[in-house]
Amino acid sequence: MDKPKPKPQPEPYGLIPRWFMEQTLGRDCGYKQWLRTTFGGDIAERLIADYYIGGSAEGDAVFWQVDSADNVRTGKIMSYDPATGKRHKGEEAYTDWVHSVMRREGALPEGWQLKQCLYGEHLLKRRPNEIVAVAEGAKTAHVGSALMPDMVWVAVDSMLGITSERLEPLKGRKCIFFADEGRGYEEWKERLGPIAHGVGFQYLLSDFVEEHAVLSGGDIADMIGYEELRERNE
């Protein structure tokens, strides 16, 4: 009888030193300012603390990916307008990754490999019995957590972030997926069934954004009446 083949070992991946993340947490940035003016100080500070929202030396937001073992995988650096909460356009636009910056500066060892995790994954173990809301982007997760805090909000970073590997931490959980309007919704509708079956989680794909979005490619964050929220917090 043939011996069973050994299970393939997971590919090794690199981590970012935790102190590197921690030094960004005390820095302010336009995105944090927008959170405070929109949702009020208490909610904003909860979001900033829960999601480890950092700031770069240049004033950009850093959205850290911290896994369920509290390891820092990487961070996404993005510039936001503090008045509108929207990403800067044109010459002011900036998007980068912490691991890419460190690699360019020679601060990572040779052979360092990235393995992304769910944004907000570290929150799952803190709230093991609550429904998980899965969004595409970090900002949508923040807005969702501010307005619907009874669910644990995480994000997959992009439309194509729906993979068995990325969603493995959802095993045994009940989940609601909020895809962005348009192609994202159709992509998730096609892919989620087999992934949920393989990983072992229950899910509902919400069509709220698909039914109510005005702009193509819209998400929950695009649909919120921020002016009304600001007036309530003034």
Question: What are the functions of these language-model segments?
Answer:
Residues M1, R46, W97, V101-R104, ...:
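Compositionally biased, intrinsically disordered low-complexity segments
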Residues M1-R73, L123-P128, E231-E234:
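TOPRIM metal-binding catalytic domain and adjacent DNA-binding surface shared by DnaG-type primases
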Residues R18, A44-E45, D50, G59-D60, ...:
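Intrinsically disordered, low-complexity, compositionally biased regions/tails
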Residues V62-K171:
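Phosphate-handling DNA/RNA-contact segment within nucleic-acid enzymes
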Residues S68, G85, N129-V132, A138-E234:
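TOPRIM fold recognition
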